[in-house]
């Protein structure tokens, strides 16, 4: 679990309810050439686009929360992945949170997903399309056993591994966060084709979905990428460390969000000045 303290604020995707943020008051994308700005956990996006809610290959959950916006690169990835999934007859891809219309910090649910390059994709592939009621109030399938050390065999399906593998092999994808037990199962099942596994990173929670992160777009000059994952498949000592008791440490104090990138602060200032 190396460097987990450093990465905690930036990467954890399920966080306690936070105070309301001004970003959720921006109801439409900011006009302009698409630009992802700042980091994944402290940024925004100009020229975001909404993911079309109607598709033969995927369905969008909780559309009433309006978290289905992203940089065009993210939309293109979702279309590619869902088309490949459909072609292989794996099932319908279920799309969870992406970003808000201008990106920025959510009031609840995530610390990242701020620059329009993150998407949550559920690890279930229904053969029958969900009803509108199911999409608005989706029921996740927890794939991980109570002890957190393994997946539940009755729930683990080969299609899930195929979905994760397809995403990991996409050139625009830099990281996929899953529960350590899911990563462990992928390591066991991968066979000789293992190069894609280094993109699949163990992380807290993520028991029913994968969190896919894309690289900074080439023309987004203010976008801040993460360092590339370490070489190798990540199936050795690093993965095993996640199943060890954490070292004792002092109770962490409350932390304030870091200052926004100047361009994101200017975006907020300009938006609310013209209201």
Curated annotation (Swiss-Prot):
Protein residues bound to Zn(2+) 2: 147
Membrane-spanning residues: none
Entry's EC annotation: 3.4.24.-
Keywords: Disulfide bond, Hydrolase, Metal-binding, Metalloprotease, Periplasm, Protease, Signal, Zinc
Co-factor(s): Zn(2+)
Composition bias, Pro residues: 244-262
Protein name (database record): Penicillin-insensitive murein endopeptidase
Source organism per UniProt: Yersinia pestis
């Amino acid at each position: 679990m190396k460097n987990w303290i450093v990465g905690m604020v930036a990467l954890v995707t399920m966080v306690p309810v936070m105070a309301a943020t001004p970003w959720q008051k921006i109801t439409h994308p900011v006009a302009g050439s698409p630009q992802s700005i700042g980091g994944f956990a402290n940024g925004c996006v100009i020229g975001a686009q909404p993911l079309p809610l109607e598709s033969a290959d995927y369905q969008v959950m909780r559309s009433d929360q309006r978290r289905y916006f992203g940089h065009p690169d993210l939309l293109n990835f979702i279309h590619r992945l869902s088309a490949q999934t459909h072609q292989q007859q794996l099932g319908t891809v279920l799309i969870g949170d992406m970003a808000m219309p201008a990106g920025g910090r959510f009031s609840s649910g995530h610390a990242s997903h701020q620059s329009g390059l993150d998407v949550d994709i559920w690890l279930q592939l229904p053969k029958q399309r969900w009803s509108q009621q199911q999409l608005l109030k989706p029921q996740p399938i927890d794939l991980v056993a109570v002890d957190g050390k393994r997946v539940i065999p009755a729930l683990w399906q080969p299609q899930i591994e195929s979905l994760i593998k397809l995403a990991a092999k996409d050139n625009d994808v830099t990281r996929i966060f899953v529960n350590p037990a899911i990563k462990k199962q992928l390591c066991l099942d991968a066979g000789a084709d293992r190069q894609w596994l280094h993109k699949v990173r163990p992380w807290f929670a993520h028991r029913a979905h994968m969190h896919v992160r894309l690289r900074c777009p080439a023309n987004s000059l203010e976008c801040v990428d993460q360092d590339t994952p370490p070489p190798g498949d990540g199936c050795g000592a690093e993965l095993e460390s996640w199943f060890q008791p954490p070292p004792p440490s002092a109770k962490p104090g409350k932390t304030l969000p870091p200052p926004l990138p100047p361009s994101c602060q200017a975006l907020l200032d300009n938006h609310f000045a013209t209201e």
